[in-house]
Amino acid sequence: MNLISIPAFQDNYIWLLANRQKHCVIVDPGESAPVLATLAQGQYVPQAILLTHHHNDHVGGVADLRHHFPDIPVYGPQETAKKGATVIVNDGDSLTIAGQNYTIIAVPGHTLGHIAYYSSPYLFCGDTLFSAGCGRLLEGTPEQMYASIQRLAQLPDETLICCAHEYTLSNLKFAHAILPADQDIATYQQQIEQLRSKNLPSLPVKLQFERKINVFLRCNDIDLQRKIGTTSPPDSLVSVFCELRSRKDSF
């Protein structure tokens, strides 16, 4: 499989996953022009569009892409029905597109109907889990978002996180501010600074590594809890998540 990150807007990524026959899926096309250019350059043949949620920077290119490819199915959660989705999918559904199997995972939090698509090893998770961070809670509750990222964290170590924004460096700066002595975070921040200085993407990233440098996946870390002045029994780690999310919102 060939995975391509297509830059869009200021910091979005539209994902394209193609097989050897150059049949591909397009994930969260916020705009059509860069997608059409990539399709033409690589002679890819789109088989489906996958939408994770209803925000315009993820669905804005759907109408024009369907103008160019009238028969292409557009999969998405119920909240995208008025944003171009032609096939509504729900938690636990399975899709087979261009010989690749996809499992739908409900991940409410950023929006109430947000979903992710998992096709081993690829995880297209929209604005739920970012490298070294997570999405803002625009519609859902902290409990929902914490449960969602924990659900994604249970996927296999080799899972490749294909999120929709280049937020890695800013997320690492926040993580370093919380845990300044953490060498994994400090070293990775330096690596990403070099990468971004060359305008290269920081994504995708393996989940196994993400568990080390993403503070939102480390709410049970005693040292982290001490640093933010929050201690929680295992059944209320969401309070640690809430404190982290609140601090990140104002960082």
From Swiss-Prot:
Positions contributing to Zn(2+) 2 binding: 57-58, 127, 165
E.C. code: 3.1.2.6
Family: Belongs to the metallo-beta-lactamase superfamily. Glyoxalase II family.
Cofactor list: Zn(2+)
Function: Thiolesterase that catalyzes the hydrolysis of S-D-lactoyl-glutathione to form glutathione and D-lactic acid.
Annotated metabolic or biological route of this protein: Secondary metabolite metabolism; methylglyoxal degradation; (R)-lactate from methylglyoxal: step 2/2
Biological-process GO terms, alphabetical: methylglyoxal catabolic process to D-lactate via S-lactoyl-glutathione
Alphabetical list of InterPro entries matching this protein: Clx_II_MBL, Glyoxalase_II_hydrolase, HAGH_C, Hydroxyacylglutathione_Hdrlase, Metallo-B-lactamas, RibonucZ/Hydroxyglut_hydro
Enzyme class: hydrolase
Positions annotated to bind Zn(2+) 1: 53, 55, 110, 127
CDD domains linked to this entry: hydroxyacylglutathione_hydrolase_MBL-fold
Annotated protein name in UniProt: Hydroxyacylglutathione hydrolase
GO molecular function: hydroxyacylglutathione hydrolase activity; metal ion binding
Highest rank taxon of the organism: Bacteria
Self-association and partners: Monomer.
Keywords for this protein: Hydrolase, Metal-binding, Zinc
Cofactor note (record): Binds 2 Zn(2+) ions per subunit.
Reactions that this protein is recorded to catalyse: an S-(2-hydroxyacyl)glutathione + H2O = a 2-hydroxy carboxylate + glutathione + H(+)
Organism: Yersinia pestis
One Pfam family hit: HAGH_C
